[in-house]
């Protein structure tokens, strides 16, 4: 026969309840339950607790052999068998009626424990109370869910932080390297674990030279549309503007007359061909270099 004991927490209500299985050994049970003291415990409290099962929900289940006592020298008061247990000894009770029976009941509150003789397990002990676990098993269960119990270990690896992203040096001018370092700080976006976080753009160092090339091409296009007089854009190379046939004919005629142009001729040709004086000067320089290359090539052949 198994005797179950229910104790409420010491800081709420120091009450004790004894539940007996009316199997014919009530005298033997009263002898085995000697030495349990519960403060202001009366004989009729057992019936009161059985009549209000809602008060038993936050309590803790203890076995008859591992019950902490709050006092030693107080006189022993025994509880008579409960009427509810006598009338319905074989009735089925809902699970959790005697508190949580999952964890072991070997608990100590710095008080003396008086053990009684071992009793064979009965139907109530096997069905409503699990005392097979030990204190070591209790601590191991607590360690399993100690930290982050709601985050499962999925197949994804930890996402690298900003310091883990390798920096690939690129071959560029000193001025361009300064701009690339600033762009890498601004365009970086850390990875997030949001549902749409994996689809967001991630910084890649290999994409920076391509972005710089696109920026240069846009600047060169802007300078080509502004005209020849605007010299504010010095970064990109201007687009080459070919000369017309009328302009080339006038320039070739002056070059045949004199390879080196004077200031008066330059102003006159600039007014006739609608070109700047600088363009006329550059054309004469390039024409002399071209003729020199042709002469050197003929000398090497001959």
UniProtKB/Swiss-Prot annotation:
Q: Which GO terms describe its biological process?
A: fin development; negative regulation of transcription by RNA polymerase II
Domain of life the protein comes from = Eukaryota
Q: Locate the compositionally biased regions of type Polar residues.
A: 217-227
One Gene Ontology cellular component term attached to this UniProt record is: nucleus
Q: Which Gene3D superfamilies match?
A: Homeodomain-like (1.10.10.60)
UniProt cross-references to PANTHER family, sorted A to Z: HOMEOBOX PROTEIN HOX-A13, SEGMENTATION PROTEIN FUSHI TARAZU-LIKE PROTEIN
Q: What does this protein do?
A: Sequence-specific transcription factor which is part of a developmental regulatory system that provides cells with specific positional identities on the anterior-posterior axis.
Task: Provide the protein name.
Answer: Homeobox protein Hox-A13a
């Amino acid at each position: 026969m198994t005797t179950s004991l229910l104790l409420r927490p010491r800081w709420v209500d120091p009450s004790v309840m004894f539940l007996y299985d009316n199997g014919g050994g009530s005298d033997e049970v009263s002898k085995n339950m000697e030495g349990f003291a519960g403060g202001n415990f009366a004989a009729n409290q057992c019936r009161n607790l059985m009549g209000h099962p809602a008060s038993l929900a936050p309590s803790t289940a203890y076995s008859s052999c591992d019950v902490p006592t709050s006092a030693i020298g107080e006189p022993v008061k025994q509880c008579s068998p409960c009427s509810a247990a006598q009338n319905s000894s074989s009735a089925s009770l809902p699970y959790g009626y005697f508190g949580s029976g999952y964890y072991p009941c070997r608990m100590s509150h710095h008080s003396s424990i008086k053990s009684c003789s071992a009793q064979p397990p009965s139907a109530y002990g096997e069905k409503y109370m699990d005392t097979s676990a030990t204190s070591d098993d209790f601590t191991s269960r607590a360690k399993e869910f100690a930290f982050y119990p709601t985050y499962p270990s999925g197949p994804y690896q930890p996402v690298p932080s900003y310091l883990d992203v390798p920096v690939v040096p690129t071959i560029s001018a000193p001025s361009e390297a300064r701009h690339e370092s600033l762009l890498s700080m601004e365009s970086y976006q850390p990875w997030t674990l949001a549902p749409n976080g994996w689809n967001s753009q991630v910084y890649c160092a290999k994409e920076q030279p391509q972005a710089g090339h696109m920026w240069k091409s846009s600047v060169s296009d802007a300078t080509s549309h502004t005209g020849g007089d605007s010299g504010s854009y010095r970064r990109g190379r201007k687009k080459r503007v070919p000369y017309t046939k009328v302009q080339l004919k006038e320039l070739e005629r002056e070059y045949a007359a004199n390879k080196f142009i004077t200031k008066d001729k330059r102003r006159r040709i600039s007014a006739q061909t609608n070109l700047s004086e600088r363009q006329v000067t550059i054309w004469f320089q390039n024409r002399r270099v071209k003729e020199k290359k042709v002469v050197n090539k003929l000398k090497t052949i001959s």
